[in-house]
Amino acid sequence: MKQRTIAKNVDIVGIGLHKGVPVKMRLEPLDSDMGIIFYRSDAGVTIPVKKEFVVDTKMATVIGKDGVVISTIEHLLSAIYAYGIDNLRIVLDNDEVPVLDGSSAGYCMLIEEAGIKELEKSKKAIKIKKEIEITTEDGKRVTLKPSDRIVYDFEINFEHPAIGKQKFHFDYSIEEYKNNISRARTFGFLHEVQYLRSIGLAQGGSMENAIVLDKTKVLNPEGLRFDDEFVRHKILDAIGDMALLEYTLVGEYDAVAGSHHLNHLLTKKLYEDEANYEIIDLEEASSEASVFEMAYSKVES
């Protein structure tokens, strides 16, 4: 199995979630072994998608270098990672990725518009060898477990009548991601949005790019795309955060009330001990390669 990039440049214009200002973004193909990189054209700074460059995880995943940051990268990275793209340059003229409709569906469409191109060098993956876990005193947990498959399990429990307790199990394939994960939107509570706006954040947030809830119900007139859209979006976010591993994951991700911050701690902990993982060549590891071949096949046939 070979590394992948996109076949041609594609452009999109949108607004950033927090500043609410317009941003132009272009996806550009890259050669083998270049990885996923962001380039801030207004600042002339390149920032690789690596855990070492994560500078903030409170409201979103933010990477930075030399005082230049790029915020809210997780939805775009989720689509890139789900489509198995290994090498890509993302050019932005501002410090936030466009929020689009609050999901990653628009990014899936953009990638499909660009097309997928196989490169010459073999694709690599990171295979989990030992279970690792991050926990908190209030019961939150994120875990990576050994598996020959690519699986995401997530559980949330909100004391809100429109959310409550939700679980979702995702067996990875591009088709399943596109149909069942990518369309799930980010969500927030009205009182939180009002507070964030009072401190200069969420300026671009609206019911056009997020699910908004008051104390009892969903305020969006169109309602939900899935009954369990909230937990599906948490999986979307987790996939985007796992892109910071730099290699495609082979293993099981399992979370209870996970977050960007816990995901970042998990990726750091994984790399602390080489016994936790193995970097495998998918030209040589036929059983693992077959998992990806099946995952890629339906949407590309």
From Swiss-Prot:
Gene Ontology molecular function: any one: metal ion binding
Family matches, as Gene3D superfamilies: lpxc deacetylase, domain 1 (3.30.230.20), lpxc deacetylase, domain 2 (3.30.1700.10)
Protein origin, superkingdom: Bacteria
InterPro entries per UniProt: Ribosomal_Su5_D2-typ_SF, UDP-acyl_GlcNac_deAcase, UDP-acyl_GlcNac_deAcase_C, UDP-acyl_N-AcGlcN_deAcase_N
UniProt keyword list: Hydrolase, Lipid A biosynthesis, Lipid biosynthesis, Lipid metabolism, Metal-binding, Zinc
A cellular component term, taken from the record's GO annotations: membrane
Active site: 260
Disulfide pairings: none
Pathway: Glycolipid biosynthesis; lipid IV(A) biosynthesis; lipid IV(A) from (3R)-3-hydroxytetradecanoyl-[acyl-carrier-protein] and UDP-N-acetyl-alpha-D-glucosamine: step 2/6
Protein family according to the UniProt entry: Belongs to the LpxC family.
Name of the protein described by the UniProt record: UDP-3-O-acyl-N-acetylglucosamine deacetylase
Origin organism lineage: Bacteria, Pseudomonadati, Campylobacterota, Epsilonproteobacteria, Campylobacterales
